[in-house]
Amino acid sequence: MRLGWLRFGLIAAMVALVGIVGVASASRAAEELHLYSLRQEQLIRPLLDAFTKETGIEVKLVSGKDDALLERLKAEGDNSPADVFMTVDAGRLHLAVEAGVLQPIKSETLDKLVPAQYREPSGLWYALSVRARPIMIAKDRVDPSAIKSYLDLADPRWKGKICVRSSGSVYNQSMLDAMIEHYGVEKTEEWAKGLVANFGREPAGGDRDQIKAVAAGECDIALSNSYYLGQLTNSDEESDRAAAAAVTVIWPDQDGFGVHVNVSGAGITKSASNKENAIKLLEFLVSDAAQEIYAGKVYEYPIRDGVPLSPTVEAWGKYKADTLEIAKLGTHNAEAMRIADRAGWR
């Protein structure tokens, strides 16, 4: 009898131990989430580390480039480990919506802190930071008062003076998208043809390269997202700082629609197995602490008012932003690409 009770006790203890281990494993799994991000890791890592420190939730980061990560998410379907999809342009967020890989969420915190202009109406994604795309000119060769609007860049007086990256850049596609929304297809195409006629060189490189080309005298005017100028200004490389010092920022269309702005943003995937943790991450990324990192270390504009800007960004002055609903960027993408093709903007 004693042997029977002993055997029963051992079995019960083993069952209890397995249960404890299972609960512990489930608990550990619940304290993590998987993030697919098109943002460069060195830019997003400080934010993720701060989130983990505050919440104890570990973020498993998978970084990717261009549209490859979205294609991976689509291919994985319901089996994808991704809980959050983060990207750097409203046009790409629109593609994610069209692909059906995001799910709508409800969050009083996000709805309160993220302006309606900067989120998808049904809650499929929320913007996390704002990036402006102003005109940048050579300080010593261009009179700032000579350019008041993006439309001025098509003026023949600037023939051979403009540098801009390829129309394959989603930043330029979204800008064309916004112009179609404001001006219509015909006027946008006319502008694109005039812009191409003024190119100082074939489009090459990224936005930093356009700024450097102005500094080197290859052209006098460039289009670039503003945070790239912030990165060059604060670079460890003397040549980068010199390039940044050679240009100044023009905020166009201040008497009209305002400067073109875009966003970085994120949404919760349909496959999310850590949905609550994923929502916590998005809520953290619009908190004061996270928004100060976006402003101070990434040189972007906070999604909300009241967050101090980087001194570098503040030095560029205030601007009126385009009030176009950001979720509309991407809706004219196919037409924007056709316009670029007809204009010869490669």
Model-assigned labels for residue ranges:
Residues 174, 178-252:
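Ligand-binding pocket segment of bilobal, Venus flytrap-like solute-binding proteins
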Residues 186, 300-346:
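An extracytoplasmic/periplasmic, membrane-proximal ligand-sensing/linker region
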